[in-house]
Curated annotation (Swiss-Prot):
InterPro entries per record: G_OBG (IPR031167), GTP-bd (IPR006073), GTP-bd_Obg/CgtA (IPR014100), GTP1-OBG_CS (IPR006074), GTP1_OBG_dom (IPR006169), GTP1_OBG_dom_sf (IPR036726), OBG_GTPase (IPR045086), P-loop_NTPase (IPR027417)
Its EC number(s): 3.6.5.-
Domain spans labelled Obg: 1-159
Binding sites annotated in the UniProt record for GTP: 166-173, 191-195, 212-215, 279-282, 308-310
Protein's organism: Rhodopseudomonas palustris (strain BisB5)
Protein name in the entry: GTPase Obg
Single GO term (MF): GTPase activity
Domain of life: Bacteria
Family: Belongs to the TRAFAC class OBG-HflX-like GTPase superfamily. OBG GTPase family.
Keyword Electron transport: no
Amino acid sequence: MKFLDEAKVYIRSGDGGNGCVAFRREKFIEFGGPNGGNGGRGGDVVVEAADGLNTLIDYRYQQHFKAQKGVNGMGSDRHGANGKDIVLKVPVGTQIIDEDKETLLHDFTKVGERFVLAEGGNGGFGNAHFKSSTNRAPRHANPGLPGEERWIWLRLKLIADAGLVGLPNAGKSTFLSKVSAAKPKIADYPFTTLHPQLGVVNSDGREFVLADIPGLIEGAHEGAGLGDRFLGHVERCRVLLHLIDATCEHAGKAYKTVRGELEAYADTLTDKIEIVALNKIDAVEPDELKKQKDRLKRAAKKTPLLISGVTGAGVPEALRALAAVIGEAPVSDKAIGTAQNAADAKPWAPQDV
């Protein structure tokens, strides 16, 4: 299945049905009273977080979604039926953002969570509603109210416990394939990984989800390479595993490059707990490995782990370190900065005349 983490869609809730002007017509009853029914309410546009989805690819092929219109009222006091809601299914971790790409409307963090994005218009009153002691035969009715329409952005931020970051060719995909059943593409050239990959890791009986993010290069926050568009997927991670290639020219500079891009994207990423590991230790001589380790230690101000995704050396220790942090980190069930649900607001209703 193709991966798509951003989509722009048009949504419109259903219009309300019109009220009806009608009068009772029966034999021997010359002046039957009003009996026009009310119009039905238009359908809502609802977004629901569904299990089993991990991409927004469906919204590449369909961008317009309209809920059903309410049925018009009819004579004999027959009220119109309400229009059917339309439900958009999205993966857990999806954010709804306004057309300006800045205003966050809702953030889905749990399976089954629902959000009313646009309410259907209320149905109009039929003339029977306006009957009174002073107006026995009202000859007017309300039209139904129009539904709401807007363009919105759907943005997916995968929910993973831990995230893999590093320069291209740091060995992130090899590491993920070693510790999980994920099968990312692995090759000896930069940007082999074009989309985030997820894998379920088991460490001493404890399971967690690990995300492999496409490699970063200097200037990624300005669009260089694949840019920083995929960094949003590690915003929800509780810990980052920063892999540095031991065969690179200078491990310390490589570390600072990635840290600089993380900081340029969002300060919250640099505040996350980070485990630093020097990867591909099987591909360098002992003397060179010691130099790279010392360089990385000075840059990161912590002692790095020494691992090899190919031979598996040091990998169990890295997984235990991740699992220990994940086990201690609190999990928040609250959505992040969500706007008030439209359903909380009192809907407009036609006024009595």
